[in-house]
């Protein structure tokens, strides 16, 4: 399979895993879609998608290359495992849908978004878990060569993230407008836990690889 296709698939799968968990953006899309229709929810989705893509693009094109030093790379590799494990457990143990954080609320008070587009944009901007997640994923994908260092491959990965996130946001917008918020909290939590299981599987595979590398280096 060509590296650029692998990069796109990597971005698509990781984008979907991070888009599904229920947070303020998904709840806003659902509520607005149910009350004001698809167009309103789609504009929120567009703003949220743009900010998500910007965070992801910066992580893959700027910060990932900073961690190329061997020691830093190993530390970040271990950090990525801990991060994915923790995030997966957090999603898996979710018992209620999350409300906006204090940072998100402060940003909304400061920027006072007057359009649906800016509401989605600011909601993602204030969620510091988004850039943190993409930073760890960027380092992880780079160190395991899932995303080729070539600019075209990195662009393909970011495009994969945008595609998956966009499909989820706009699909959620359509479903909310069509079904008038027929998704129950229980259904949303099940989807979030499914995403958590996916992250735990990825963390487990990464942990096994770290153990194998340590065992291999010990016997050299």
Residue ranges and their predicted role:
Residues 46-58, 126-129, 161-169:
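Membrane-embedded alpha-helical segments of transport systems
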Residues 3-74, 136-156:
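Juxtamembrane transmembrane-helix termini in multi-pass membrane transport proteins
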Residues 2-4, 73-78, 86-131, 135, ...:
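Alpha-helical multi-pass membrane helix bundles of inner-membrane/thylakoid proteins
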Residues 60, 126-131, 199-213:
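Hydrophobic alpha-helical transmembrane segments in multi-pass integral membrane proteins
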């Amino acid at each position: 399979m060509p590296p650029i296709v692998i990069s796109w698939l990597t971005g698509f799968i990781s984008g979907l895993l991070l888009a599904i968990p229920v947070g303020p953006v998904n709840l806003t899309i659902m509520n607005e879609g149910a009350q004001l229709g698809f167009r309103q929810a789609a504009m929120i989705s567009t703003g949220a998608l743009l900010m998500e893509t910007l965070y992801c693009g910066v992580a893959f094109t700027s910060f990932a290359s900073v961690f190329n030093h061997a020691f830093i790379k190993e530390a970040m590799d271990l950090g990525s495992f801990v991060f994915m494990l923790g995030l997966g457990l957090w999603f898996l143990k979710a018992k209620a849908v999350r409300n906006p954080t204090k940072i998100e609320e402060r940003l909304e008070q400061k920027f006072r978004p007057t359009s649906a587009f800016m509401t989605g944009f600011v909601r993602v901007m204030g969620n510091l878990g988004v850039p943190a997640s993409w930073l760890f994923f960027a380092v992880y994908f780079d160190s395991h060569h899932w995303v080729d260092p070539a600019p075209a491959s990195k662009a393909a990965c970011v495009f994969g993230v945008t595609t998956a996130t966009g499909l989820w946001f706009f699909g959620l917008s359509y479903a909310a407008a069509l079904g008038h918020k027929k998704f129950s909290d229980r259904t949303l939590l099940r989807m979030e836990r499914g995403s958590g299981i996916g992250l735990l599987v990825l963390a487990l595979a990464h942990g096994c690889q770290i153990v194998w590398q340590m065992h291999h280096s010990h016997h050299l």
